[in-house]
């Protein structure tokens, strides 16, 4: 990170990863994160400081196994046991090629070099931008970052306590320096999930920082 007056820019080893800023996760969407759209101006400002930006996109087929509608008698936000472990059931959301799955129109990052789609396998959910929830199926992002020497990862987006959290944790486990820009995130909050995220991130050495530190 280099300073220009009081403003910081990021060089060849830094990358901003913008997680799932999609219509269905913003107000009015099928799985809206409270005040999720408030982070978009912050992320746009952050992105202008980075040469390298990656977007992620939840991209589910119809009838995905994480949808409550795929489990007769079950309701959204109940938990079931999948082959890979506990799975929260969600409202149908981010269905491929629908408006809800689209990146929010207010997100203005024309130099974003890559969109990583996740959750495309019908029987496996994906919170992390690096692996599906079976912990075996990679998205390809690890190789992309390593090939380009991108070692410092700054994460922002939706939702803090799920996809942002698990992405940051996997980044750290893979040997990257990971930071969450917390005021550029919003959480869902299910049964203490925000507090659990903070505890887990701290244990792995993932700092939660503030966008104003370098805007």
Range-by-range predicted roles:
Residues 23, 61, 121, 160, ...:
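Short, glycine/acidic-enriched loop or turn micro-motifs at the edges of active sites
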Residues 179-194:
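Short, flexible loop segments at boundaries between secondary-structure elements
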Residues 29-36, 129-133:
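Short glycine-enriched, charge-decorated loop/helix-capping segments at active-site entrances
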Residues 19, 57, 182:
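Active-site flanking residues adjacent to catalytic metal/cofactor-binding acidic residues
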Residues 14-21, 25:
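Short, hydrophobic/glycine-enriched beta-strand segments
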Residues 41-152:
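Active-site alpha/beta core segments
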Residues 207-215:
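Short acidic-hydrophobic, aromatic-tinged amphipathic segments that line or gate anion-handling sites
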Residues 42-46, 164-175:
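Histidine-anchored nucleotide/phosphate-binding helix
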């Amino acid at each position: 990170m280099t300073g220009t007056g009081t403003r910081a820019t990021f060089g060849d080893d830094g990358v901003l990863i913008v997680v799932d800023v999609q219509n269905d996760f913003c107000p009015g969407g099928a799985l809206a994160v409270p005040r999720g759209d408030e982070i978009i101006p912050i992320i746009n400002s952050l992105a202008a400081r980075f040469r390298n930006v990656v977007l992620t996109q939840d991209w589910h087929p119809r009838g995905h196994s994480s949808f409550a509608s795929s489990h007769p008698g079950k309701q959204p936000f109940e938990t079931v046991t999948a082959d890979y472990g506990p799975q929260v059931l969600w409202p149908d959301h981010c269905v491929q090629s629908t408006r809800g799955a689209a990146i929010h129109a207010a997100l203005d990052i024309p130099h974003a070099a890559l969109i990583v789609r996740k959750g495309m396998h019908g029987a496996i959910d994906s919170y992390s931008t690096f692996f599906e929830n079976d912990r075996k199926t990679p998205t390809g992002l690890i190789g992309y970052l390593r090939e380009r020497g991108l070692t410092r990862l700054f994460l922002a987006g939706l939702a803090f306590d799920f996809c942002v959290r698990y992405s940051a944790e996997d980044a750290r486990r893979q040997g990257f320096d990971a930071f969450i820009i917390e005021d550029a995130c919003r959480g869902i909050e299910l049964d203490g999930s925000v507090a659990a995220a903070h505890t887990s991130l701290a244990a792995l050495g993932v700092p939660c920082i503030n966008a104003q530190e370098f805007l």
